[in-house]
Structures are given as C-alpha cells and as structure tokens.
C-alpha cells in the first residue's frame, strides 16, 4: 500500500511512522493518563486496516484524521488534543511556504498527482513542468487572495469544484468556437505578422494549425474549428492547378482535351487535399502550446454548413480524407500505427448521409470504420439538435455547448465586429464559455442523511454557493483588455475589438456562456431512493434534480443577463478527488462511496448492465436537460469486423439523441507487439497496466488509448479514473 504525501509524491505506507507520531503525543501528557504501547500498536493497526479498506492510496491528511479518531475512541483525550495541536502547528508552518514543496516535487518528477492529473499532458517534459509550476503559483494566489474563503474551503472539501484554479490568476476564459472563416477570408495577425487570405487549400490548412496553436496558448479549455471554413479553398486550388496544367500542356504542344485536363486537375487536387489534411493531423499532435500540451482541438464535419452543392462536394472530399487519415492513425516512435488523441472529430448525421441511398452514405460507412478502429468520430444528430436547439453547431472542444443565439434575435447586432457577420443569421463561431463550477451531488445527498426536505434545503444552499463562485469567474473576466490575447479579441478568432477595448460586452446578452456543472447524479439518487436512476421509481426524482438546476440557471440569467447553462461535467481527474472527499466526510458506504470515482454527470453507472440502445434512449432525456453541454457513450468490444452493428448504433443516435460516441480500446505493447487490450491489474494495492501477452508493466513502453471524458486520453490516469475504466461493462 502507498500513501500520497502533501506535495503529491507517493511513498510506501509505514506503520512505524504512525506509532512514532502517537508516541510523541503520548509522551507529552502526564504519565498517569498515557496510553500503553499495546494501545498505540492497536490504534496504528486499526488505521492501517481502514486504509486498506479504501482500495486506493490514502493521503497523509486522511491517515491523520483516522489517527485522531482512534485516539479519541480509546478515551485518550489529552493525547488527542496534543496530537491535534501538533498537526495545527505544522500546518501553519506549511501555510507560510505554500508552493515550494509541490514545485520541487514537480521538477523532480515525483508528484504522482501531477503525473496522473491530465490524460493528455506528460509531466516529465520541461514545457509541461513549466505550465504546472505556473499553475501551482496561480492556484496558491487564487486560494489565498483572489477567491472568498468559503469557496476555497468548499472546493478543498469536494463540496464543489472550482475548475481550472491553476489559470484563474490570469484573465483567461475556458473554451470556444474559433471563427476560422473570418480569419482565413479576411486575414489575421499572428505574433505581429499580417496573414492575408491564403491562395491554396494547403496554405489554408497550414494557417489554420497556426491559429489553433495561438488560440490554445491564450485559453485553458478546448476549441473547435469547422472543415466547412476550409472548403472554399478547394476551389481556389482547383482553379490554380487548372492554370498550371493548361500552361504545362501548352508548353509541350499537347491538347488532351477538356475532359482529360479536368481528370488531371482533380487528381492533383486530391493530392493537395491529402497533404493539407495531413498537415492538420500532424501539426496538431506535434505542436506544443504554452500550456505544455498539444492543443485540445475538435474538428467539426457537417455537410449541411456548405453554402452550395459545389462547396458541399468539396467539403465531402476533405471529410473523406480526414477520416481516411485518422483510420490509418499516426506512427509511434517504433514506427507502429497507433491512435492519436487529437484532433477530436465530430461527424454530423443528417439526411444526406444517414440512409444507404443517401448521396454521402459512403462517408458514414467510412466514419463507422474509423470509429471502430480509432474511437472517433463522435456523432451529432442534425435531426435531434434542430428539434431541441433550433440550430446545428458543434460543441466547444469536448462537450460544452453554447446556448442558442438570442442576441441576433434581439437585434443587438455585430457586437464582436466580425468581418463575416451576416445580419439576421444566427452566430456561433466566435463565441466562448467563461468558465465552470461543479456541484458534487452525492455530497448533497449524504449531507442530508436521506431526509428529502433537508436534501432540497442543502441543494438550494449549494447551488447558491456555485452561483457565487461563477460570479467570481465572470467578474475575473470583466475589464479584461483585448490586448491580453490579440489573436482572440483583436484579430478574429473571437472578435475584432479595438486595442485597449475591454471584452465586457461579450460577457452579456448570451454572446458567451458560463456553466453550472454537476457530477454523480447516479450516486445521489441511489442514496436518496435506494435505486439507480434507471429504475422507473427513481427516474422522476433524478429528473426533478435536473430541472431544479435548470430553473436556477434561468433565474440567474434573467437577473444578470448572463447565459448560465447546465453542464454535465467531464470530471477527468476530479472524479478521484470527489470520491476521496466523500469517503473522508462520510466513510465507506456500499454502492455510494466505496469506489475511487463517482459517475460522470447523468450517466448510467459504469457497472450497470444495460444495452447500448436502452442506454442512449434513457440518457437522451437527461442530455436534453443539460443544454450547456453533455455527451453520452456506449462501451463496445472490437467492432472492426462488425461495421453493420456500428452503423445501426449511429442510426439510433440520429433518431434519438443529440450527441454520442462509441468507446472501444486501441492499445499497443512496444515490448512484444501485442495490439489487443492492455489490461488493468492490481499490484500491491495499486492498479497498473499490464500486457497480457508478455507481462510488460512499463507505461513508457506501451500505447494505451481510452475515452476519458469526451476526449481520448493517452497519458494514463489517476487511480480513481483507472478503476472506473476497469469497471466499465460492455453495452453491445
């Protein structure tokens, strides 16, 4: 068994340290009231037993809490008092020097929490370490100076989660839809250099990747671009290539005829599209931003965005090439094709591609093959999204969705000064999310003790606490000058404001959103009703919880003219933190707090047996009540030899739910070449990854790709998320 120290490093559990600490406190009291060595030994053994029952690595603080409890349980109150006093004195010393130990542990690569905090960041490399070091300083300033203490304490206790505190010291927003069309068609500026409208598709792709990197370096969340914004440059290249081919034919005195020339032009055009798409794929996974990671980028593929049939056909060629290259994958350092984490791909299911007789059905078949092998694309239903939101648009990065455009309907106009603004047309590209605060629903339930009246009272209080935290997020952005991130606010990615102008007008009237997140609906309902929220007897209670959160968002929105929106939090590493906090506050409760994770958002619990179609049908009603963002998934086996089944799931998505994905496995052992599933096994109380063929357990010598929270993770996960991945049951 191992222990997580305060600086995040991991050490072997040592019972003698507990005995020594209790003995020291014991010796500080009068001899007449001291405990015997046998009592101290029993306390230490009891603490060790409690830690083993956690099925995870306990923190030093948790161990000390257990020691305090056991000393008092033995009636040694004076000893307990001295033990508490010693802890408090030590905490004061640590508080006076809040970041040094954590930063040093990051530099020396012994911080286990940092190693597993983000499934797409490698904390060993210098660039990532610099980001983490800056994050520690930001988090420290945030907790000591910038945030109200009640929010800091609620965050520490896992009552709420104040997302991305490591970026809060700066005036940065979360995620967005990049207005790539405006930047490519009307020019932009990158690091002081004017970038004019590109004269070929390949150049447009190259500029797009530079924009993506610049945007990622000026925010902390994900971003999305649309292939539709690249499609007009296919025709630009077509005309350019035609002139070159005609000149070549003339130079040699050849006249192959218009049909042959067109064939040659289209062949060269296809090659340019291949190179352009390859530029996007390889630039995205090899670029490093100031965040110490590849850009968290989503590529949107929606035929319905095309302006005309010619552009739609050109867009289809780009989508086809994007899918073909993702199906192939990228090579790892051993030259083996593996699954990359980025870009995330989203493919829209629509009338033109959802049936066998549709003109673009071939793209849907290719998408199905790609999903079966590489876990992307994910799918948005044009039909369901238009029904529920009125428009069809992509999420910002992983799952965060904008609210439907209300500022255009209100006649507010082009507040971002975009050069591609069309009066009366709803606007989505160029909009963004201000930030997220998540409520821990199981904590609300457990705090109520199962009393329904008490539950709703506590729920109301916690929601208002989240509201206060979200107002802090909003106010941190108010007054931000456009100069803070010129690529975003001055040169078209989000707006074209004047130098020195603040971004304030973009924070109101629904131009941007701010998200109330939630997690653990399953555990919350299970504790309050004794049943899963899939049980018809418990579903109405689950839906009433969802409706209450939406009602609060509507109330805040009306009062402040800010688009608060309910968001199904993705909880990448926070699932482990919430689980540990619940165990510390309420103990181990079977089916509620007995794991190292809590269930994401509204999802069916990962251990619950349910088929793919029933899961999607059930979760659709909750996705409708998460307008600020949510995604559903089904866990499937290797489907590469059963593409018709994948297509059936996709058709079901089209008819039943806005946004969903299929999860499979994509692994490779660099020691023996095994390309089946790398397994999760327990070793000395810790979950590790192990090749079933050769027994390799070295994470540096294997490629493992798993769906983490909408994105694909490839850098491994903390113990809580790893346990959740292990516990997932198949739905097909």
Mark where each language-model region is:
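Long insertion/accessory domains within large nucleic-acid-processing enzymes
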Residues: 695-732
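Metallocofactor- and cofactor-centric catalytic cores in central/energy metabolism, strongly enriched
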Residues: 273-277, 281, 526-527, 721-727
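Charged, amphipathic alpha-helical regulatory modules used
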Residues: 1-110, 726-731
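Conserved catalytic cores of very large enzyme subunits
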Residues: 89-510, 531, 535-697, 703
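Contiguous, well-ordered alpha-helical segments that form the cores/surfaces of helical PPI scaffolds
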Residues: 301, 514-527, 547, 707
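Amphipathic, well-packed alpha-helical segments that form the structural scaffold of globular domains
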Residues: 23, 467, 471, 522-526
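Conformational switch/transducer regions in large eukaryotic molecular machines and scaffolds
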Residues: 14, 681, 686, 708-711
């Amino acid at each position: 068994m191992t222990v997580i120290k305060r600086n995040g490093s991991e050490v072997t559990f040592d019972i003698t340290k507990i005995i020594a600490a209790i003995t020291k406190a014991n010796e500080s009291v009068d001899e007449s009231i001291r405990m015997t060595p046998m009592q101290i030994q029993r306390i230490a053994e009891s603490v060790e037993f409690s830690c083993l029952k956690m099925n995870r690595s306990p923190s030093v603080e948790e161990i000390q809490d257990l020691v305090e409890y056991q000393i008092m349980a033995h009636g040694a109150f004076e000893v307990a008092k001295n033990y508490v006093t010693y802890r408090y004195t030590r905490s004061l010393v640590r508080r006076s020097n809040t970041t040094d130990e954590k930063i040093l542990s990051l530099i020396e690569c012994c911080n286990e929490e940092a190693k597993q905090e983000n499934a797409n960041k490698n904390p060993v490399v210098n660039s990532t370490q610099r980001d983490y070091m800056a994050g520690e300083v930001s988090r420290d300033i945030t907790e000591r100076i910038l945030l109200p203490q009640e929010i800091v304490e609620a965050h520490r206790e896992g009552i709420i989660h104040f997302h991305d505190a490591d970026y809060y010291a700066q005036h940065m927003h979360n995620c967005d839809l990049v207005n790539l069309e405006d930047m490519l068609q009307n020019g932009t500026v990158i690091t002081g250099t004017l970038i004019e409208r590109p004269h070929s598709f390949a150049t447009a792709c190259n500029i797009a990747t530079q924009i993506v990197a610049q945007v990622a370096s000026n925010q902390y969340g994900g971003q999305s671009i649309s292939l539709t914004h690249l499609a007009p440059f296919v025709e630009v290249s077509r005309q350019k290539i035609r002139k070159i081919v005609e000149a070549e034919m003339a130079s040699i005195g050849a006249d192959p005829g218009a049909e042959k020339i067109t064939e040659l032009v289209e062949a060269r055009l296809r090659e340019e599209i291949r190179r352009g798409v390859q530029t996007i794929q390889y630039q995205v996974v090899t670029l490093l931003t100031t965040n110490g990671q590849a850009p968290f980028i989503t590529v949107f593929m929606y035929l319905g965005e095309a302006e005309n049939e010619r552009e739609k056909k050109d867009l289809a060629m780009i989508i086809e090439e994007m899918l073909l290259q993702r199906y192939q994958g990228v090579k790892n350092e051993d030259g083996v094709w593996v699954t990359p984490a980025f870009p995330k791909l989203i493919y829209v299911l629509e009338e033109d591609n959802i049936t066998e007789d549709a003109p673009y059905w071939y793209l849907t078949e290719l998408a199905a093959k790609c999903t079966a092998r590489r876990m992307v694309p994910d799918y948005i239903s044009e039909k369901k999204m238009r029904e529920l939101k009125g428009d069809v648009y992509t999420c910002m990065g992983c799952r965060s969705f904008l609210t439907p455009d209300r500022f255009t309907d209100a006649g507010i106009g082009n507040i971002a000064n975009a050069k591609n603004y069309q009066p009366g047309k709803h606007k989505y590209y160029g909009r963004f999310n201000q930030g997220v605060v998540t409520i821990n629903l199981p904590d609300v339930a457990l705090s109520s003790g199962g009393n329904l009246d008490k539950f709703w009272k506590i729920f109301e209080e916690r929601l208002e606490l989240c509201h206060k935290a979200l107002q802090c997020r909003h106010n941190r952005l108010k007054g931000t000058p456009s100069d803070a991130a010129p690529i975003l606010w001055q040169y078209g990615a989000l707006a074209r404001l004047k130098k020195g102008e603040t971004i304030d007008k973009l924070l109101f009237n629904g131009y941007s959103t701010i998200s109330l997140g939630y997690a653990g609906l399953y555990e919350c309902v299970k504790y309050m009703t004794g049943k899963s929220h899939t049980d018809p007897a418990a579903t109405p209670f689950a839906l009433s919880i969802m409706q209450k959160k939406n009602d609060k968002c509507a109330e805040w929105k009306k009062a402040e003219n800010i688009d608060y929106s309910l968001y199904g939090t993705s909880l990448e590493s926070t699932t482990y933190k919430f689980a540990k906090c619940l165990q510390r506050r309420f103990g181990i409760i079977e089916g509620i707090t007995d794991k190292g994770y809590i269930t994401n958002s509204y999802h069916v619990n990962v251990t619950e047996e349910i088929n793919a179609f029933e899961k999607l049908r059930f979760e659709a009603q909750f996705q409708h009540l998460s307008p600020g963002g949510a995604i559903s998934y089904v866990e499937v086996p290797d489907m590469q030899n059963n593409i018709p089944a994948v297509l059936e799931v996709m058709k079901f998505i089209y008819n039943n739910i806005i946004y969903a994905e299929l999860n499979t496995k994509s692994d490779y052992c660099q020691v023996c070449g095994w390309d089946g599933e790398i397994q999760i096994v327990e070793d000395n109380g810790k979950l590790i990854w192990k090749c079933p063929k050769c027994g390799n357990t070295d994470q540096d010598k294997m490629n493992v790709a798993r769906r983490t929270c909408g994105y694909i993770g490839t850098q491994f996960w903390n113990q809580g998320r790893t346990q959740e991945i292990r516990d997932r049951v198949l739905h097909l």
